[in-house]
Amino acid sequence: KPGVKVIKLPADIPPERFIGGGCGLPTAMHAVQQAQVQVGDSVVVQGSGPVGLSAAILALLSGACQLIVVGAPQLRLDMALEIGADAVINIDELGPEERIARVRELTGGRGADITIEASGSPAAVPEGMRMTRDAGRYVVVGQYTDAGDIALNPHWDVNRKHLEVRGTWGIDFGHFYRSIRVMAKYGDRFLWERLITRSYNLEQVNEALDD
């Protein structure tokens, strides 16, 4: 119908690969665009779901020289290491202060140049701010629903460290288009279809929703 845009899926992208990228890859595309990752940056990604792992991939393709993924479960963190993460931090094993200290340790005491929040947990936001270096950039992409309020210290977490905070909301046609181009070129390297952990037939649709 009028106003609807359609992109033809290239023949060399298997349907499973496209579904694995889903809306997570275009969402991550928008986030990394906002993050403005540059060659040589250290990047932390909070969240190891489809958006977080896709953001990790795009950060590497944008030139990040150090990539740290914070999340759970270990299966997803293992995927992050296969993608090319330099280090992973399991939130089931370390508490918030320990996670911040670990990022500081891995970045030589500075903190990350850029942190991308893709966890969906409001508590991750002040934690991620403290993982980011002075005059660094913090991008929030995971807060797609109202999951509650957070407490932060605007003096120490934002003003004093001159932190730049950016948010992203939604995706447009261009993010889908560029995502398909990325998948066509790098799909055999990053294998988005690995993000699919189970498939359902149409008769199992209610079971899929319950799961």
Task: Say what each PLM segment does.
Residues 63-65, 111, 189-194:
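A local structural motif
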Residues 6, 11-98:
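Mid-domain Rossmann-like dinucleotide-binding core that forms the NAD(H)/NADP(H) cofactor-binding site
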Residues 73, 144, 171:
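Residues in the short beta-alpha loop(s) of Rossmann-like NAD(P)-binding domains
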Residues 136-137, 152-194:
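Rossmann-fold dehydrogenase core element
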Residues 1-4:
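A short glycine-rich beta-alpha junction/loop motif
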Residues 34-39, 61, 78, 82-164:
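Glycine-rich cofactor phosphate-binding loops and adjacent beta1-alpha1 units
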Residues 102, 126-130, 173, 177-211:
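C-terminal hydrophobic helical "lid"/dimerization subdomain
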